[in-house]
């Protein structure tokens, strides 16, 4: 069996958030088809993809994410990360709604982890143990390029990955 180093824990966190946004009718992926594309663009994207996203779907709301791995000390079998979501929209109320939903989804420590574990991809090697809100910055008073505003929320979470019982290396 070959270890998949491409699949990272933040994929599951982003998937859980996108599912929740769709379930609450806050994002409709049918609105995210660019001309000539057969599949919608995912509105949760790394900062490097923002120029292309804005060129293909100008004016659409999107979420920029960034992930930082945190030190867990000698508990090497556990991992912790902080993911930051920067909601970018032209609608202040929409930004606040997204922040409120993200807060509600991820503020419940082990209960939030249970929810994320229930929507994992069958290929996910991860198990999540807790989530917590680190900080939430409401809608910024200034406007970014193109009339966009933004709001920021940071979430920390703990997880483990399937490992070889003898070597401790990822499976």
Segments predicted by a language model, with ranges:
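Polar/charged alpha-helical tracts
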Residues: 19, 30-31, 93-100, 104, ...
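Hydrophobic beta-strand residues in large extracellular and virion-surface proteins
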Residues: 13, 17, 21, 63-65, ...
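Acidic-leaning, charged glycine-interspersed low-complexity segments
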Residues: 106-168
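Interface-prone segments of viral and bacterial extracellular assemblies
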Residues: 1, 19-20, 74-78, 158-160
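Small/polar-rich, solvent-exposed N-terminal microdomains that initiate assembly or binding
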Residues: 1-71, 112-116, 170
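Short, solvent-exposed beta-strand/turn "edge" segments of beta-rich domains on protein surfaces
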Residues: 72-78, 143-148
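Oligomerization/assembly interface segments of phage tail-like spikes and tubes
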Residues: 77-95, 100, 149-161
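Short acidic, S/G/P-rich loop/turn micro-motifs used as interaction or catalytic elements
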Residues: 71-72, 92
């Amino acid at each position: 069996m070959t270890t998949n180093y491409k699949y990272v824990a933040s994929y599951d966190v982003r998937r859980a958030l996108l599912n929740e946004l769709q379930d609450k009718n806050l994002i409709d992926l049918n609105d995210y088809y660019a001309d000539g594309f057969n599949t919608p663009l995912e509105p949760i994207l790394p900062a490097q993809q923002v120029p292309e996203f804005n060129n293909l779907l100008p004016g659409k709301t999107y979420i920029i994410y960034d992930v930082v791995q945190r030190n867990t000390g000698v508990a090497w079998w556990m991992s912790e990360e902080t993911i930051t979501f920067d909601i970018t929209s032209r609608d202040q109320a929409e930004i606040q709604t997204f922040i409120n939903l993200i807060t509600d989804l991820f503020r419940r420590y082990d209960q939030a982890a249970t929810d994320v574990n229930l929507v994992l991809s069958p290929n996910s090697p991860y198990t999540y143990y807790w989530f917590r809100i680190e900080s939430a910055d409401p809608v910024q008073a200034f406007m970014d390029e193109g009339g966009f505003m933004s709001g920021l929320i940071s979430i920390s979470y703990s997880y483990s990955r399937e490992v070889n019982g003898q070597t401790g290396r990822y499976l």
